[in-house]
C-alpha cells in the first residue's frame, strides 16, 4: 500500500488511473473521507499496491461485435455533481422611515356662539316671577307741529368754512427788526444781582470761660513749686489769631480783665477784648499783694531754658548785678523802646513771648515799680521764701 499526497487539481479518479488501480478499491481504503468527490491539497490518500486489472474501453471507430452487450461505465455513479447556484430566498429588509410623531391639530379655539345679552345674575335667579308689563299705546299728535322746525326759517344756515383760507386779511405793518448782537447767546446769559455792600453787623459778645494754664513739667531739682500760673491782666489789643479762626469778641462790661495766655496745653480759641483795662480784679488779685504780673511768663534761670521777654516797649535795666540771694531788688524799666520778639518770639507761644502791644496805661518815662517780684520769685512759694 502506498500513500499519495494530494496536489492541486487531483481527484480519486486521477489518482487511481495514475497508479493503475480500481477506484472502488481506493475508496475502500480511504474510509476517513466523508466526501470522496471532494479532496483538498495536502490530504494523504492510501493506494493499494497489488496490481488490479484495469478494463480497457473499446477504441472509437470500431464497431462492437455483434451480440456484445454494452456495459455501463463503472464510474458513472461517481460523476461529479453539477453545482447548482441557490439564490438566497431571504426577503430583503425594506428601509424603514424614521418615526415622526403626529402633529397636533393647530386649530384655533372654537368657542360656542352664545348670546351676549342673554345672561343672568345671581339676583335674577332668586327673584320671584312677575308678569310682563302691558305696552302703553303711543300718542299721536295730528295737529301739533314742532316749533323747532319754525326756528330754522328765522336763522338761515351759515356759509361753509371751506373758503375761509382765501379770505382777505388786513396787512400788518412791517416792524423794524432788532439788531443782532454777535457772540452772546441768550440761553447762556445769567442775570445776576450786582454786589451791594452789606451793613455792618455788631459782633456777638459772650462771657469768656477762664481756665488756669498749667506749667510745663520740669525736673524737681529746678526751682519753682510746679503750681499753675496765676491770672494776669488781659491784653489791650487782641493777639495774633491763628489762621482760619476769628478772634472772640468779649463785651467790655463783662470782661473781668483777665484772660488765659496760650500755652502748649491750650486748645481754646479765646482772645483778648478791645479796650480791657490793665488792672487786676479784686477777685483775681495777686496772691502776694504786689503789682499784677506782666503779660509774660517768667522761666527759671537755668542753662538751656527759655529766656523771658520783657513787656513790649520796655527794656529791663538793673543798676547792680544780682547776687543770687533772691532779694527784693527789682529791675527798672527804661524809656519806651520798640523791642522785638523774645527768644522764641511767636505771639502764640506760651514761653519767651512779649506783649506785641504797649500798655495803654503805662507812662512814657521810666519809672520804678516797687514790690514787683523778681523773675526768679514769680512762681516761688511764700513759705519757702520766708525760710
From Swiss-Prot:
Superkingdom per UniProt: Bacteria
Q: Which UniProt keywords apply?
A: Sporulation
Q: What induces it?
A: Transcribed by SigE at time T2 of sporulation.
Q: Biased-composition ranges for Basic and acidic residues?
A: 70-96
Which GO MF term does the entry hold, naming one?
Answer: ATPase binding
Places the protein is found: Spore cortex
Q: Where is the LysM domain?
A: 2-47
Task: Give any Gene Ontology cellular component.
Answer: endospore cortex
GO biological process terms, alphabetically, are: sporulation resulting in formation of a cellular spore
Gene3D superfamilies recorded: LysM domain
Spell out the Polar residues composition-biased ranges: 368-377
Other observations noted: Several coat proteins are extracted in reduced amounts from SafA mutant spores, one of which is CotG. SafA mutant spores have abnormal coat layers and have lost their resistance to lysozyme. Their response to L-alanine suggest that they have a defect at a late stage of spore germination. Their response to AGFK also suggests that they have an additional defect at a early stage of spore germination. The mutation of SafA has no effect on vegetative growth and spore resistance to heat and chloroform. In wild-type cells, during the early stages of sporulation, a product of 43 kDa (the predicted size of SafA) was detected. However, in later stages, a 30-kDa species was the major form of SafA detected. The N-terminus sequence of the 30-kDa product starts at Met-164. It is not known if the smaller form results from proteolysis or from translation initiated at Met-164.
Chain's role: Probably involved in the assembly of some coat protein components implicated in both lysozyme resistance and germination. Could be required for the assembly of CotG. Associates with SpoIVD during the early stage of coat assembly.
Q: What's the name of the protein?
A: SpoIVD-associated factor A
Amino acid at each position: 500500500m502506498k500513500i499519495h499526497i494530494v496536489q492541486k487539481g487531483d481527484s480519486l479518479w486521477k489518482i487511481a488511473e495514475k497508479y493503475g488501480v480500481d477506484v472502488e478499491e481506493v475508496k475502500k481504503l480511504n474510509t476517513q473521507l466523508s466526501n470522496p468527490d471532494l479532496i483538498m491539497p495536502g490530504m494523504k490518500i492510501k493506494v493499494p499496491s497489488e496490481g488490479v486489472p484495469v478494463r480497457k474501453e473499446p477504441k472509437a471507430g470500431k464497431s462492437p461485435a455483434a451480440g456484445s452487450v454494452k456495459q455501463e461505465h463503472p464510474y458513472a455513479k461517481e460523476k461529479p455533481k453539477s453545482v447548482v447556484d441557490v439564490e438566497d430566498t431571504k426577503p430583503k429588509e425594506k428601509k424603514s422611515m424614521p418615526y415622526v410623531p403626529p402633529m397636533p391639530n393647530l386649530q384655533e379655539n372654537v368657542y360656542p356662539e352664545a348670546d351676549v345679552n342673554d345672561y343672568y345674575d345671581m339676583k335674577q335667579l332668586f327673584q320671584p316671577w312677575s308678569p310682563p308689563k302691558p305696552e302703553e299705546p303711543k300718542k299721536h299728535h295730528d295737529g301739533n307741529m314742532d316749533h323747532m322746525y319754525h326756528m330754522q326759517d328765522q336763522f338761515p344756515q351759515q356759509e361753509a368754512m371751506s373758503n375761509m383760507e382765501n379770505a382777505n386779511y388786513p396787512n400788518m405793518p412791517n416792524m423794524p427788526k432788532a439788531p443782532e448782537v454777535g457772540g452772546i447767546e441768550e440761553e447762556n446769559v445769567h442775570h445776576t444781582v450786582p454786589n451791594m455792600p452789606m451793613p455792618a453787623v455788631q459782633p456777638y459778645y459772650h462771657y469768656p470761660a477762664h481756665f488756669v494754664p498749667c506749667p510745663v513739667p520740669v525736673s524737681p531739682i529746678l526751682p519753682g513749686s510746679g503750681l499753675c500760673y496765676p491770672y494776669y491782666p488781659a491784653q489791650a489789643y487782641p493777639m495774633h489769631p491763628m489762621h482760619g479762626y476769628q478772634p472772640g469778641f468779649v463785651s467790655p462790661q463783662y470782661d473781668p480783665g483777665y484772660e488765659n495766655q496760650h500755652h502748649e496745653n491750650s486748645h481754646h480759641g479765646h482772645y483778648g477784648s478791645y479796650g480791657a483795662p490793665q488792672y487786676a480784679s479784686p477777685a483775681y488779685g495777686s496772691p502776694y499783694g504786689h503789682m499784677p504780673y506782666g503779660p509774660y511768663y517768667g522761666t527759671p534761670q537755668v542753662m538751656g531754658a527759655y529766656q523771658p521777654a520783657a513787656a513790649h516797649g520796655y527794656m529791663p535795666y538793673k543798676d547792680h548785678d544780682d547776687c543770687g540771694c533772691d532779694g527784693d531788688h527789682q529791675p527798672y524799666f527804661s524809656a519806651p523802646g520798640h523791642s522785638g520778639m523774645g527768644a522764641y518770639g511767636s505771639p502764640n507761644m506760651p514761653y519767651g513771648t512779649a506783649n506785641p502791644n504797649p500798655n495803654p496805661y503805662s507812662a512814657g518815662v521810666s519809672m520804678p515799680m516797687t514790690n514787683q517780684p523778681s523773675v526768679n520769685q514769680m512762681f516761688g512759694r511764700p513759705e519757702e521764701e520766708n525760710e
